[in-house]
A protein has these predicted regions:
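Conserved SAM-binding motif I beta-strand of class I
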Residues: 247-252
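S-adenosylmethionine
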Residues: 281-359, 371
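S-adenosyl-L-methionine
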Residues: 256-299
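C-terminal catalytic and target-recognition region of SAM-dependent MTase-like enzymes
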Residues: 335-400
Length: 400
């Protein structure tokens, strides 16, 4: 079947020409030929120069997501297998693959698709109409590729229930792909055991992007008193505990998260040294300050305070406040680990916000290290949306 041809306006497609994968609604001059939303189309520059192929959705502001820059490349089974194999080979070289993100959307040149592997379970998240049509074929390819390395997948669960699907005029979907199975799976990361609930946990069930950041805080936590804020299912707290922390307190507002965190503590035999409190962090930290509590290590891993540029001002206030509160609770010479998972809170703004927080509470901070997301969430420099996690470790220093 002949594919429709989309021609860009003169001077448009700047993101595309710099290596990006998105074409927005206001960049298109004309469309020649018939198509349905989700179809693969051919993209031309204003002068007829071939830019590649991608899938189109007229209901989305992101009109086209590019699949290839090669004008004559067919988007078929062989193409998808090539993409999946490339993604898996990259993970085998860069991360512990027992649990990892196998497909990371645009950064793996499969725009809109996320696939996480938790031991022998796959979790799929589809965020774009075109890739949604291909997801089951891609899953079958991935299972076959994994089997070549002796890995058998016992089940696949879909977590395409994010609100962002509504931007593509797609329903939110959650459920089994294929046969039903027990959706709780045990994984081991950095020597810590977790029970992951892929059905009812946040996002795909567990935040794999912080894998090596969790490992990085272990060396700071031996014999330390640690406060882990926004603990979710206890991952940073448990890394502190397994590293030999004297006492760890994990805080989160989610009762389900705290329940799972306590289960994970029991799983690791850490319930005597790692406790979890269900509370709003913004309410609890001022109370701890009033009580004169201080810790050797404070960890701040908040959810994204903003998911759009429109709310960045309020989000900045939130990040500033939480870092001010956190710094006040660190003993002199102690450590603050702080991060932001919002793409819109970029590196420069996050750094500036922490600096302002330190000035506001009259704290001198010494940078220990700066980190980003784990390599299984690769940052593609031509796709700025792939760079979202910023992670700092600081020492709170007093001049003696």
């Amino acid at each position: 079947m002949r594919q429709a041809i989309v021609t860009l306006k003169k001077g448009e497609g700047r993101l595309l020409k710099s290596g990006g994968a998105w074409i927005f609604d206001n960049e298109i001059d004309s469309i020649m030929g018939e198509f349905e939303n989700g179809d693969i189309v051919i993209v031309h520059d204003f002068d007829g120069y071939g830019m590649g192929r991608g899938f189109i959705n007229m209901n989305s502001k992101i009109r086209i997501r590019m699949m290839t820059r090669k004008q004559d490349q067919e988007i078929d089974h062989a193409f998808l297998e090539m993409r999946v194999r490339d993604a898996w080979e990259y993970r085998k070289k860069t991360v512990d693959t027992s649990s990892c993100r196998v497909i990371f959307g645009e950064a793996d040149f499969l725009p809109g698709l996320v696939i996480d592997k938790f031991s022998d379970v796959l979790v799929v998240e589809s965020l774009a109409l075109g890739i949604d049509r291909m997801k089951e074929e891609i899953v079958d390819i991935l299972k076959a590729v994994l089997s070549e390395d002796g890995i058998t997948i016992r089940g696949v669960y879909e977590r395409s229930d994010a609100k962002v699907r509504q931007n593509e005029d797609m329903e939110r979907v959650k459920g089994f792909i294929g046969e039903e199975f027990d959706t709780k799976v045990e994984i081991v990361e950095n020597g810590v055991r977790y029970m992951v609930d892929v059905k009812d946990g946040q996002k795909t069930g567990f935040f794999l992007d912080q894998k090596y950041n969790r490992l990085a805080i272990q060396r700071l936590c031996k014999d330390a008193e640690v406060l882990d804020c926004f603990t979710h299912t206890g991952s940073f707290a448990l890394n502190a505990g397994i590293a030999g922390a004297k006492r760890v307190t994990g805080v989160d507002a989610s009762e389900l998260g705290i329940e799972q965190a306590r289960e994970n503590a029991r799983l690791n035999g850490l319930e005597d040294r790692v406790e979890f409190v269900c509370a709003d962090v913004f309410d609890l930290l001022p109370k701890l300050e009033e009580e004169g509590k201080q810790y050797d290590v404070v960890i701040l891993d908040p959810p994204a305070f903003t998911k759009s540029r429109k709310t960045i001002k309020n989000a900045t206030k939130g990040y500033r406040e939480i870092n001010m509160r956190g710094m006040k609770l660190v003993k002199p010479g102690g450590y603050l680990a702080t991060c932001s998972c919002s793409h819109f809170m970029d590196y420069e703004l996050f750094t500036k916000t922490i600096h302002q927080a330190a000035q506001n509470v009259h704290k001198r901070i010494r940078q220990v290290e700066y980190r980003t997301q784990a390599p299984d969430h690769p940052i593609l420099w031509s796709a700025e949306e792939s760079y979202y996690l910023k992670f700092y470790v600081f020492q709170i220093v007093d001049e003696k």
